[in-house]
């Protein structure tokens, strides 16, 4: 009996000691095995990759959560199906980043420097990145205590000449019976590349569209179709503008498509923002509502707050929004009655006269209006 008590006491002691040790070594994962305590996690807390900032066509900054030592790196062009998202690895397996970083033969040559107590790595490439082209940074880093992180980080070539545009027409209501779908029409007022420019709808990230790398000229017309529904859909990325044969396409305009299978734009109430990410600049915005809508929803209020100081509207209060139903709207918004910018012809005249159009173009509650039967995707006049 005494022998049994002794065994139980010793066992309890062992369990308590094991538990204390496990707690003491957190955050290392551990378990109690037949042979004692066994470490099954990697290391303590590895560095965290916090952000990647493309500064210009030759400079990229990578920010970590703490001071790091860069053990190895490679910068390459985008690898299809392997570089679609951030990849971090803190285990003992050979990750994509670690596999790639062991081969320096195909990397883009660059020089390194460090900032902010070695928590920021600055890559200065010897060759310029191409506008809108995808690249990867593969790296292995360690902190001061040897905790390591391997990562595969995609970034996009810097857009050094962002094209300037304004919105000219919005169809907010679809008509599936006749094949009419919502769209936003744009007029290019200064040539350049549209890579990285965003169309933000209703303050919802899931509704945001980012333009691909396309060179455009002053006077070009672009039509963005959020709904990828119907026949004859083609993204006209290159010079041929006759590829698309959808009901809403026009061979004189460039048609670009989102990926949604359902409506994205609010029928009567919404805020659409044209945002230049590179220069942190709001090019254009339009707010619209039906007369009996007296407050924005939570997400739309975020969009309203975002454009409040842009100088487009006097303020982003809902009272300044353009009417789609009731109020001063001559007819209600529909697939055939679209919201149109009323001073488009004046802007076109400036373009034809080679006059500069300053952005943002100021508007008020009368600058946009529902036009009866006036829908004309891709036709700006």
Predicted regions and their residues:
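N-terminal secretory signal peptides that target proteins for export/translocation
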Residues: 1-9
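C-terminal motif of bacterial Sec signal peptides marking the signal peptidase cleavage site
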Residues: 26-29
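A structural motif detector for short, solvent-exposed N-terminal "entry" segments of globular domains
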Residues: 31-44, 48-57, 147-203, 261-268, ...
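Acidic, low-complexity Ser/Thr/Gly/Pro-rich repeat segments typical of extracellular/periplasmic
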Residues: 59-65, 70-159
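Short proline/glycine- and polar residue-rich coil/turn motifs
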Residues: 113-117, 212-220
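Solvent-exposed beta-edge/loop recognition patches
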Residues: 130-132, 220-381
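Short alpha-helix capping/helix-loop boundary micro-motifs
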Residues: 205-212
């Amino acid at each position: 009996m005494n022998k049994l008590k002794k065994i139980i006491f010793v066992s309890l002691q062992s369990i308590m000691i094991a538990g204390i040790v496990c707690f003491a070594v957190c955050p290392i994962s551990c378990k109690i095995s037949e042979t004692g305590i066994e470490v099954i996690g990697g290391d303590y807390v590895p560095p965290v990759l916090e952000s990647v900032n493309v500064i210009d066509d030759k400079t990229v900054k990578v920010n970590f959560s703490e001071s790091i030592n860069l053990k190895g790196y490679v910068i390459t062009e985008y690898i299809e199906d392997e570089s679609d998202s951030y990849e971090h690895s803190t285990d003992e397996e050979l990750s994509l980043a670690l596999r790639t970083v062991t081969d320096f033969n195909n990397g883009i040559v660059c020089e390194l420097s460090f900032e902010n107590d070695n928590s920021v790595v600055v890559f200065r490439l010897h060759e310029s990145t191409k506008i809108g082209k995808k690249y990867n940074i593969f790296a292995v880093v360690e902190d001061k205590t040897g905790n390591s992180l391997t990562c595969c980080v995609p970034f996009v070539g810097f857009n050094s000449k962002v094209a300037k545009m304004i919105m000219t027409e919005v169809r907010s209501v679809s008509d599936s019976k006749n094949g009419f779908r919502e769209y936003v029409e744009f007029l290019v007022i200064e040539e350049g590349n549209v890579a990285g420019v965003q169309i933000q709808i209703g303050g919802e990230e899931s509704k945001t569209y980012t333009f691909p790398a396309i060179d455009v000229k002053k006077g070009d017309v672009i039509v963005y179709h959020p709904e990828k529904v119907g026949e004859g859909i083609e993204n006209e990325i290159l010079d041929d503008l006759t590829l698309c044969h959808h009901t809403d396409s026009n061979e004189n305009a460039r048609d670009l498509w989102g990926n949604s299978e359902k409506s994205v734009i609010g029928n009567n109430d919404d805020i659409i923002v044209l945002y230049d990410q590179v220069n942190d600049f709001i090019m254009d915005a339009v707010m619209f509502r039906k007369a009996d809508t007296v407050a924005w929803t939570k997400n739309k209020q975020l969009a309203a707050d975002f454009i409040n100081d842009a100088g487009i509207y006097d303020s982003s209060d809902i009272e300044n929004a353009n009417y789609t139903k009731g109020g001063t709207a001559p007819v209600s918004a529909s697939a055939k009655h679209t919201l149109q910018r009323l001073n488009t012809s004046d802007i076109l005249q400036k373009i034809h006269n080679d006059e500069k159009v300053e952005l943002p173009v100021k508007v008020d509650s009368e600058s946009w209006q529902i036009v009866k039967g006036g829908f004309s995707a891709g036709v700006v006049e």
